[in-house]
């Protein structure tokens, strides 16, 4: 994923950027790839993590929901003599692609890739004019569908929760007024309206469209739901001693990962306001520090690493728990299938 969408060369809303694997040394240390191990890279992208894992002698099953990434990676498949298998799939389905004996490791790098941002026709960037799309694959509802069809109340919830946008009501009402005259079709069209209606004092640090574009991208691709389901899937697919390593770039994503590992540590609630609960068997144990961030040296070389956070867990022998989405407390956002209904 690309951090800080909206400013300079590292934006999820801007660009261009050159893809450099973030926290690569730290990922490899937590993942511990070695000959004979099967590692699943849930976010193949440009193949940065997969390449390093292969260099350590492990076998790699790499997933990506973007068919262009899978097509671009075929030369890499040919170069590694059968040790790399590429699969067009969302990482929430990673358990479907695990070998029968289970996985030795899973690594997830959450969010949009620099390759997607660099292609104006994908509609991720407000600094590159293109169709208002933002889909990581060709399926499902586009950002234009959301902007042109969602109820104002739904737009406010989407912008506020997924983008942490304080001006969500102002922007949503401006969108409603403008789309009644002419629907939004391009990224620059939407970004221009947001810039027009956002108070000048809000424009100091980042482009005013940054948070709205982030929210739309996360919503269109169900990124938080995908992440949550991938964590549950990894719990099922990892063998005892297997490692789950997750790199996030946004506080919403990091909270989900932190909550998952905390819950799977099996400890009972310590709140004096709740009934005493028995401790559950931990399905994950900590690997290294609870959270690892990029060094100043890496951040200087690769600015997208500044907001990156790595969390990792070691799979125990305890049985996987049931996948319960209520663990994360997601709000009730608009249904993709009922926009404008």
Swiss-Prot record:
GO terms for biological process: rRNA base methylation. Keywords: Cytoplasm, Methyltransferase, rRNA processing, S-adenosyl-L-methionine, Transferase. It comes from the Bacteria. One of its GO terms (cellular component) is cytoplasm. It catalyses: cytidine(1402) in 16S rRNA + S-adenosyl-L-methionine = N(4)-methylcytidine(1402) in 16S rRNA + S-adenosyl-L-homocysteine + H(+). It is found in: Cytoplasm. SUPFAM superfamilies: Putative methyltransferase TM0872, insert domain, S-adenosyl-L-methionine-dependent methyltransferases. It is an enzyme of class 2 (transferase). Pfam families: Methyltransf_5. Specifically methylates the N4 position of cytidine in position 1402 (C1402) of 16S rRNA. This is Ribosomal RNA small subunit methyltransferase H.
């Amino acid at each position: 994923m690309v951090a800080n969408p909206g400013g300079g060369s590292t934006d999820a809303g801007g660009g261009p950027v050159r893809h450099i694997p973030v926290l690569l040394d730290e990922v490899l240390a937590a993942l511990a790839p070695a000959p004979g191990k099967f590692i699943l890279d849930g976010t193949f992208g440009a193949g940065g993590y997969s390449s390093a894992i292969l260099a350590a002698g492990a076998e790699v099953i790499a997933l990506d929901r973007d068919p262009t990434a899978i097509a671009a990676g075929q030369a890499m498949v040919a170069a590694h003599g059968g040790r790399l298998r590429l699969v067009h799939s969302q990482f929430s389905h990673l358990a479907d692609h695990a070998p029968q004996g289970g996985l030795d490791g899973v690594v997830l790098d959450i969010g949009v890739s620099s390759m997607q941002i660099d292609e104006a026709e994908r509609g991720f960037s407000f600094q590159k004019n293109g169709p208002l799309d933002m889909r990581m694959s060709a399926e499902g509802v586009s950002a234009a569908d959301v902007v042109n069809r969602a109820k104002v109340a739904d737009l406010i919830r989407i912008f506020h929760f997924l983008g942490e946008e304080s001006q969500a009501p102002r922007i949503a009402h401006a969108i409603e007024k403008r789309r009644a005259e002419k629907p939004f079709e391009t990224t620059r069209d939407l970004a221009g309206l947001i810039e027009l209606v956002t108070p000048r004092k809000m424009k100091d640090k980042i482009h005013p469209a940054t948070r709205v574009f982030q929210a739309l991208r996360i919503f269109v691709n169900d990124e938080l739901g995908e992440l949550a389901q991938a964590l549950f899937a990894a719990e099922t697919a990892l063998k005892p001693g297997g490692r789950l390593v997750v790199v996030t770039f946004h506080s919403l994503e990091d909270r989900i990962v932190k909550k998952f590992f905390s819950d799977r540590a099996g400890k009972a609630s310590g709140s004096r306001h709740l009934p005493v609960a028995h401790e559950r068997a931990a399905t994950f144990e900590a690997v290294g520090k609870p959270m690892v961030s990029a060094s100043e040296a890496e951040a200087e070389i690769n600015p997208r690493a500044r907001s990156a956070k790595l969390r990792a867990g070691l799979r125990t022998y305890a049985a996987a728990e049931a996948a319960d989405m209520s663990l994360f407390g997601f709000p009730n956002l608009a249904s993709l299938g009922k926009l404008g209904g």
